[in-house]
Design a protein with these regions (language model features):
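A short alpha-helix-loop-beta-strand transition element characteristic
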Residues: 1-13, 68-70
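Short loop/edge segments at beta-strand edges and connector loops
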Residues: 3-5, 134-139, 261
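Active-site/ligand-binding neighborhood in enzyme catalytic cores
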Residues: 15, 20-149, 160
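Hydrophobic residues at beta-strand termini and immediately following loops
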Residues: 19, 220, 260
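Aromatic-acidic/polar surface patches that form glycan- and anion
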Residues: 112-119, 192, 267-274
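Mid-domain catalytic core of redox enzymes
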Residues: 138-248, 252
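C-terminal catalytic lobe of FAD-dependent flavoproteins
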Residues: 232-288
Length: 288
């Protein structure tokens, strides 16, 4: 592991400011001189919009107030989901923390990092085992009879032939550009919340591994409803449909069929959460 610490910036009004929101974010955007936690907490309290939390807009307003919501979250969310935050469940913006310190790390875990040779090699090493056979371009239902247990990681609605209706997913498109410059942007990931930019963020991959080059290969990331399914869309309608599939999936556990992962559990997972979910399922099955 390379012990990389993830830091994200957002390009707002010509300035790069930290995400999650922290003291520096507020000072830069509003020309303030907040210097400690107490002052930051006071600023947040003055700006937060209190009320019932029914959706992601309510969630963001309760955390950061109207101005920061409009500057950093509203249009970014619209670009990412093609929905207004008021149409999304609270969980979308609820999971983004707000800091009352100068801490600019995206995550707060004690240990953080990426596999030294990347996730492709990481997965290759996992699969390189005498008891594992990989079959590509093969329909899962052709292999069910070969297994004592089936762990399904595809779309749960597809498994059940969409009998309760199709679930919605979002995909991504990437536009890669090469620049004759060593340091194109100040962080590995820079968000672009303004509708002035069609992409949601730009990524400089070499910063994940602290490598150097006289060139910068930048990925512009675009959210899309077309393409490989990456993100479940967290609306009440989708949640209600998923609950029906979830009940059906639970019944199949007695037949040793299990649903795991983003698409099968219709849930947003970070990488560490996805791995933990798989390990917990293993313990549930084999440590009874």
């Amino acid at each position: 592991w390379n012990m990389y610490e993830h830091k994200v910036l957002s390009y707002v009004n010509g300035k790069h400011v930290p995400v999650p929101v922290n003291i520096t974010t507020v000072n830069e955007l509003f020309d303030l001189k907040i210097s400690n936690t107490s002052e930051m907490q006071s600023w947040l309290k003055e700006n937060q919009v209190k009320g019932e939390i029914n959706n992601s807009k309510d969630s963001a307003l309760a955390k950061v107030g109207q101005e920061l919501y409009e500057l950093m979250f509203e249009n970014y969310t619209i670009k990412q989901w093609d929905l207004n935050p008021s149409e999304l469940e609270p969980s979308v913006l609820e999971r983004i923390p707000v800091r009352d310190t100068f801490n600019d790390r995206y995550f707060s875990d004690k240990y953080e990092g990426l596999p030294s040779n990347g996730y492709t090699e990481f997965v290759k090493n996992i699969l390189d085992h005498k008891n594992i056979t990989v079959e590509l371009n093969t329909e899962y239902n052709n292999s069910i009879h070969k297994s004592n247990k089936l762990f399904f990681t595809g779309k749960i609605d597809s498994y059940f032939a969409d009998k309760f209706g199709k679930l919605e997913y979002r995909s991504l498109n990437f536009n890669y550009k090469t620049y004759d410059i060593e340091d194109y942007q100040p962080a590995a990931v820079v968000n672009y919340p303004s509708l002035e930019y069609p992409y949601t963020r730009k990524i400089d991959y070499k910063k994940f591994y602290n490598t150097t080059s006289k060139y910068s290969i930048i990925a512009e990331e675009f959210s899309s409803s077309i393409g490989e399914e990456y993100y479940p869309v967290p609306t009440k309608k989708n949640r209600d449909i998923y609950s029906k599939y979830q009940a059906e999936a639970k019944k199949l556990e007695s037949n040793n069929i299990y649903f795991v992962g983003r698409l099968a559990e219709y849930k947003y997972f970070n990488m560490d959460q996805a791995i933990l979910s798989a390990l917990e399922l293993f313990d549930k099955i084999y440590k009874k």
